[in-house]
Amino acid sequence: MSQYHIPVMLSEVLEVLAPKGYESYLDCTFGAGGYSNAILKSCYCSVTSLDCDPHVIERVEQIKQDYGERFSFIKTNFADSFGKLKQQKFDGIVMDLGVSSMQLDIAGRGFSFLYDGPLDMRMSAQGFSAEEFVNTADEEEISDVIYKYGNESLSRRIAKNIIKYRKIARIDSTRKLAEIVRYSIGFRKGKIDSATKTFQAIRIYINNELGELERFLANVKNILKKNGRLVVVSFHSLEDRIVKNFFKENSAKPVARSKYAKDEIKIDQNKWLEIITHKVLTPSSQEIRLNVRARSAKLRAAKKIL
């Protein structure tokens, strides 16, 4: 495994997913293969992995060499995967909704404000880039995106300064955007860089990350076997809210009845999930010390019962 990639909450994911021999699992976000590799290593099972990032292919080939026919890969976004999975159903599904270390640490991908590179941020290297967005969107749209997806209270000031700067020169690098944001906000106490929220917001918007998550969850029932488990690790409060509400809306509860009734408790047939993690799981302090990028991770899991 790449030395720079540390799968977030790996032990918790494996404990909740509970892989078993001869079962099949779906890794919706291959990244550098951390979850896929760990699941395959845990028992004699099979894993299908998804990712739309063309840069993962080298790691995909490594895992294929290690596990042979037990591992398969489909180059696709998880929200677009249903037709390509050819009616397969899985005993467990895992999703890591964060940007991988591999994406953050390559300056040319344009995800990170720590390295100077082209202002891109696209997961699939196709479609509208962050550079196009900050150089063409109007002030109100930029402000709304930064506020909605980054929860940045100074979004209007940042947007105003982006408009001012781009009248002088095109904003075409991560360094330029980060400097504009830092200038707009000024110094903030703490270890988190002032540009963090703005970069996160633009990345989420550019890749339609929340919409893709909602689209996948709306259809996930069709590819999960009965008693199959869905495990989701999110890194943003809006992502976590979507997952939490989805689990809540689809979780089965006993139908109310008289305490004197002798018939068995019935389950609402429109509800098909049983929540496994009644309280959200978060990384241990030890993991955060080893991998600061894990600090905002939240894990939720549920089981299909119908």
Curated annotation (Swiss-Prot):
Main location, first listed in the record: cytoplasm
Reaction catalysis annotation: cytidine(1402) in 16S rRNA + S-adenosyl-L-methionine = N(4)-methylcytidine(1402) in 16S rRNA + S-adenosyl-L-homocysteine + H(+)
Keywords from the UniProt entry: Cytoplasm, Methyltransferase, rRNA processing, S-adenosyl-L-methionine, Transferase
Compartments where found: Cytoplasm
Enzyme Commission identifier(s): 2.1.1.199
Binding positions for S-adenosyl-L-methionine per the UniProt entry: G33, G34, Y35, D51, F78, D96, Q103
Domain of life: Bacteria
GO cellular component: cytoplasm
Coiled coil: none
GO biological process, one term: rRNA base methylation
Pfam families: Methyltransf_5
InterPro entries membership: RsmH, SAM-dep_MeTrfase_MraW_recog, SAM-dependent_MTases_sf
Gene Ontology MF terms: rRNA (cytosine-N4-)-methyltransferase activity
Function: Specifically methylates the N4 position of cytidine in position 1402 (C1402) of 16S rRNA.
Similarity-based family: Belongs to the methyltransferase superfamily. RsmH family.
Protein name as it appears in the record: Ribosomal RNA small subunit methyltransferase H
